[in-house]
Amino acid sequence: MNLKKMMQGLVFFLTSLLVFVFLFRALLPTASPRMTKPKTAAKEITYTYVALGDSLTEGVGDSTKQGGFVPILAQSLSNENDGHYQPVNYGVAGNTSDQILDRLKKQTDLQKDLKKAHVMTLTVGGNDLRKVVVDHLSDFSLSDIRKPLKSYTANLKEIITKARKDNPQLPIYVVGIYNPLYLNFPELTSIQTAVDRWNETTEETIAQFDQVYFVPINDLLYKGIDGEMGVSEVSDGKAPIANDALYEEDRFHPNNTGYEKMKQAILEKINATKKTWN
């Protein structure tokens, strides 16, 4: 009898203990782990933007010394699209089309960047025409550009072909040339006609390629910001005209405002054509 009571008491004790432990664990808040695994943020895609060309790509005249239209175009592309556009600037002041082509053949860094590039801009031709004008300054005529224009056209085709050697679908935006002398020498109509002919030839040449686009800038720059007369500077009874879209130290290259206008023109062309990219 005593044994039976002892067994009943033991069972009651164990049952009570189990109930107590269960209730205690249920009421005790679960401790949070000290370290929680952070959520992995979506990795931003980086696109390589290769800028190849002459002083317009290098950014001569840009007071910030950051590279003219190139970095601000990359920033605008990053702001308006998914991913970050990383610019790589291969602009060299004074380069003619044959010098740009020579760099394209020899610079391994340039070749590697083009292989992975998502988009490319090209400024070329201005120094080719400038050399002709300087060589025939006193008697320049349209016939003087015939042979240089033919050489330039061949170089341009080869530049595009070699730029796409390892990246055949690379979209390329070729920027036209402009006449920086117009405001001060509007009577030199042969120079403006030569600029127009040069741009027409560039546009005709690149039309032979898919996903190569022409961006005209002459009308944006050659008459100044207001598109009419620029800024007059009167001195000793004379009134030379300063093109307010050009760098005041040489009146040849764009200034910050000029580069902003170039950037906007290229950006608008990219936005209008990127749906055609493969």
Model segments located where?
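Hydrophobic membrane-insertion alpha-helices, especially the h-region
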Residues: 8-26
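Oxyanion-hole/transition-state-stabilizing segment in secreted/luminal serine hydrolases
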Residues: 102-147
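Mobile gating loops/cap/lid regions near enzyme active sites that modulate substrate access
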Residues: 217-249
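Histidine-centered active-site loop/cap adjacent to the catalytic His
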Residues: 238-278
